[in-house]
Regions:
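An active-site-proximal beta-strand-loop segment
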Residues: 35-48
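Mg2+-dependent endonuclease catalytic cores in nucleic-acid-processing enzymes, primarily RNase H-like
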Residues: 3-7, 49-51, 56-162, 208-211
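P-loop NTPase motor core of the ASCE superfamily
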Residues: 155-194
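Short coil/turn segments at secondary-structure boundaries
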Residues: 1-4, 10-16, 99, 146-151, ...
Length: 211
């Protein structure tokens, strides 16, 4: 079991995360990359962060989500842009989600020119309200991560410390991805229209590797 975080935010609890124990990730029907951007290399600056998520049905009626990758750093703009292209090539997401704010605007425009599947995200609530809005997905044991990976534990530690933690860069990418996927119909709290949506919109990603 994990040692308790020095700071526990108690919006998203550690034991709500599900450990993906298989060395290989599941076959995912849909993959999304979620960015929180900041340009600066100063040590006091915010981090840019990215998380990659896959939707999988695991033989169930309802889809689950798995964290497929995560990275953050203090990058200048050219480095950030290079990272975004590299992450796209690594995971081949169906959608790349970038918050529509000053630091995200240049990246949105530049990446669209390269033909990447960019979607702008405009949050309509404050960070704490956004976190509460996705707790049911965690509480219903729908969110998986490979605990043996250091990057996964970094994301998990940051989500469980929120909003008391020192950093929330990963947390922003988590709430952004989960809200967007839920609102887009890829992940729903009840059965709703998931199967109809899946037939229309979700691609077969057989045989693709993620880690």
């Amino acid at each position: 079991s994990q040692a308790p975080s020095a700071e526990e935010g108690n919006i998203i609890k550690l034991d709500w995360w599900q450990n993906w124990e298989n060395p290989d990730p599941p076959e995912c029907e849909y993959v999304i990359q979620s960015w929180d951007t900041a340009f600066s290399t100063r040590t006091t600056a915010d981090y840019s962060a990215v998380t990659t998520w896959g939707v999988f049905t695991k033989g169930l009626d309802m889809p689950n989500l798995i964290l497929l990758g995560a990275e953050k750093g203090r990058w200048d703009y050219p480095t950030l842009r290079e990272k975004a292209v590299k992450k796209f090539k690594q995971h081949e997401p169906d959608s790349i989600l970038i918050e529509k704010k000053a630091s995200g605007q240049s990246l949105i425009q530049d990446l669209r020119l390269t033909g990447l599947p960019i979607f702008e995200y405009q949050p309509d609530k404050d960070k704490v309200a956004r976190a509460y809005s996705i707790t049911s997905l965690f509480h219903n044991r729908r969110i998986f991560a490979p605990f043996r990976k250091d990057w996964a534990m970094e994301v998990i530690d940051e989500t469980r410390a929120f909003p008391a933690g020192m950093h929330d860069d990963y947390m922003d990418t988590v709430t952004q991805a989960l809200i967007w996927m839920r609102n887009g119909g890829y992940v729903v709290n009840g059965a709703d229209t998931w199967l109809d949506k899946r037939e229309q919109e979700i691609y077969n990603r057989e045989g693709r590797s993620y880690y």
